[in-house]
Structures are given as structure tokens and as C-alpha cells.
Design a protein with these regions (language model features):
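Beta-strand C-termini and the immediately following turn/loop, strongest in propeller blades
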Residues: 43-49, 86, 91-99, 141-147, ...
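Positively charged n-region of N-terminal signal peptides that target proteins for export
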Residues: 1-5
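Blade-terminus and WD-like Trp-Asp/Gly-His loop motifs, strongest in beta-propeller folds
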Residues: 82-88, 130-138, 198-206
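C-terminal motif of bacterial Sec signal peptides marking the signal peptidase cleavage site
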Residues: 17-20
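Beta-strand-rich domains and repeat architectures in extracellular enzymes and scaffolds
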Residues: 35-53, 66-95
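Bacterial signal peptide processing site
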Residues: 22-24
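Surface-exposed loop/turn elements that mediate protein-protein interactions on large endomembrane-trafficking
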Residues: 45-73, 103-119, 155-174, 221-229
Length: 229
């Protein structure tokens, strides 16, 4: 029998994402405009899939918010609000049951005021993912239409223009042979990834890893690097 693996990182991801919540969905909108300017880059599959899935999770889901910021009195904070800060920009959204966001807002901070730069409500976003590029000028968002969907999309956002680019993903499905332990019969199975994980390598390169909930030597995670144009 093939040995199956479930890494610590993947266990964390499962704890935060898997939810029998009736397949909640959002309204499929955002304030950005699809201009596709970041969609003409190139994909390169890596020889070995990344199994360090914890490295794709943000270390602090609540900020940290700079100590010298004075946020508006109605700004919510706490364990149920996802916050990420980059320079003078702050991303925030309510974390709902199952550890996901039904959209989020990006605002610019100045003198105690927040000015909305961008809002995302296209689909379900996992609260633990990292969003801002290192220089804070772009966002990367992995999302699905609902909590129980594996129809993944990746959207890049240029925060200087609010222009969106939905990337054309390479084939990230998993095809493997499954054997029935009782009958011994084998069949070929094709599955979409359970998880699609993102992290910025630098301002020009985005690392994308697709993984099943359980994997062995025949269905290791797939890792790709997307180089922006």
C-alpha cells in the first residue's frame, strides 16, 4: 500500500478551510476593472512540488497595525477580522465560519482616515493567504466561487490603477491510478486540486502550489512560478 502524507502545513490549511457550511458564495463583484495588464506573463513548473505548505500562510492574521496609526472608531479589530498592512495600505475583511473571507477591502491610511482603494467580492478567499507583493503595489488573490468549490481562479490587482488581471492557469489537475482494496480493481482518476496556495517570491514572481488533501508519491503537490510581464 502506498504511504499517504498529510503535512503539518496542510493540516493547518484544512483546519482553516474545510467547512460543511452549505457552500456559501458571494456576489461575484469587485471595484476593479479587468484590464489584463498583468496576465501576459509566463508560467514555469518546478521539478519538485513544494510540500512546505505552512510557508504559504501569513504569520499574523491581524496585522500588525502600526502603533502610530489612529484608525476610525468604527474600524473592527480582533480574531474575526483579517488584516494585512503594507506601507500606507491596509487590507481587511471579516473572517466567517470555516476560516474564509466573503470579500475584503483595501484602503489607504492618512492622518487617521481610510480611503478605499479596492474592494474584492468575486468569490471565497481563504483568510490565511498572503496578499500584498513585497513592495505593496500589487495583490495576489486565490479564490473560488464557494466554500465547497475547487474551481480555482487567481487574480492579480495593480493597486496603483485598481486594474485586475485574471490569470490563465496551467493544467493543475492530478491524474493517478486508484485501486479498490476489496476488489483489487484499478481505475484512472483525475482530480482538481483541493487547495491552491500563493506566495510572492519577489515583486516579479508569484509561487503557486496546487495540492490534494492527501498525497503520496504518485500525486505530489505541483508548484509553478508565474513571472509577471
Amino acid at each position: 500500500m502506498k504511504r499517504k502524507y498529510l503535512s503539518l502545513g496542510l493540516a493547518l490549511v484544512m483546519a482553516l478551510t474545510l467547512c460543511a457550511c452549505g457552500g456559501g458564495a458571494v456576489n461575484g463583484t469587485s471595484t476593479g476593472k479587468e484590464d489584463g495588464k498583468l496576465a501576459s506573463g509566463t508560467w514555469q513548473q518546478q521539478e519538485t512540488g513544494d510540500t512546505d505548505l505552512l510557508s504559504y500562510s501569513a504569520q499574523d492574521l491581524t496585522g500588525p497595525i502600526p502603533e502610530d496609526w489612529t484608525l476610525p472608531s468604527d474600524f473592527k479589530t480582533g480574531d474575526k477580522v483579517r488584516v494585512e498592512v503594507s506601507g500606507d495600505k491596509i487590507l481587511y475583511g471579516d473572517i466567517v465560519d470555516g476560516g474564509y473571507l466573503n470579500g475584503f477591502t483595501v484602503a489607504q491610511y492618512a492622518d487617521g482616515n481610510l480611503t478605499t482603494v479596492y474592494e474584492f467580492k468575486k468569490g471565497v478567499v481563504r483568510s490565511w493567504q498572503q496578499f500584498f507583493s513585497p513592495d505593496g503595489s500589487k495583490l495576489a488573490v486565490a479564490w473560488a466561487p464557494s466554500t465547497d468549490s475547487t474551481e480555482w481562479s487567481v487574480t492579480l490587482v495593480d493597486l496603483t490603477t485598481s486594474g485586475e488581471s485574471t490569470l490563465k492557469l496551467p493544467d493543475m489537475t492530478f491524474t493517478y491510478t486508484q485501486t479498490d482494496e476489496e476488489t483489487g480493481e484499478s481505475k484512472e482518476v483525475t482530480e482538481a486540486p483541493t487547495f491552491l496556495l500563493l506566495k510572492w517570491q519577489n515583486d516579479k514572481n508569484l509561487v503557486v502550489t496546487a495540492s490534494l488533501a492527501e498525497y503520496d508519491s504518485s500525486k505530489q503537490p505541483q508548484t509553478w512560478v508565474y513571472t509577471l510581464p
